Amino acid sequence: MMDDTFNKWNKWIDVILAEITKLSIDRHIFWEVQDIINNNPKIQKPSSFYDFLRNVYGASAVMGVRKQVKIDKDSISLAKLLQEICDNPKILSRTRYFAHYKGSTVKKIAKLMGSTVEKYRSKEFDQFAGKIGDHVNPELIKLDLEELKSKAKMCEKYADRRIAHFDERAIS
């Protein structure tokens, strides 16, 4: 059961990474175009294309963030992954984490840090385990989940009140 859940989470991470990477690339492209416009006085004039670009990028970014905070039954999102980790913290054990430390790159990093692989990986895992020690601390994950939801709240309001439909209520 634990391996099935772990494998499911790994598949989710691939989906989440692809979605977040897309958001990051879209953001980069949008701001590169803004730099082109800002650095070229000849094209700095009102334009329906610029309005379109802002609207499409804004809607896409807001919906992309919104996707990552949904915890519906069939959703794959960062929030749902964090919630499942909170509910099943023993799946992310120190032993499982250490099993992924292989290869010369880790040895080089540990050596650069003036450490051994064992000490380096233990110190790194301790950030996630806290006082619990043998698996991730669900309270730390819960804090991350709460921060994600808090920061995404304005995007959700905007999406609900301006993108999905136009609401009479202000976004505030």
Predicted regions and their residues:
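Histidine-centered, metal-coordinating catalytic motifs and their short helical/loop contexts
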Residues: 145-171
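General N-terminal targeting signals
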Residues: 40, 171-172
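Amphipathic alpha-helical interface segments
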Residues: 1-149
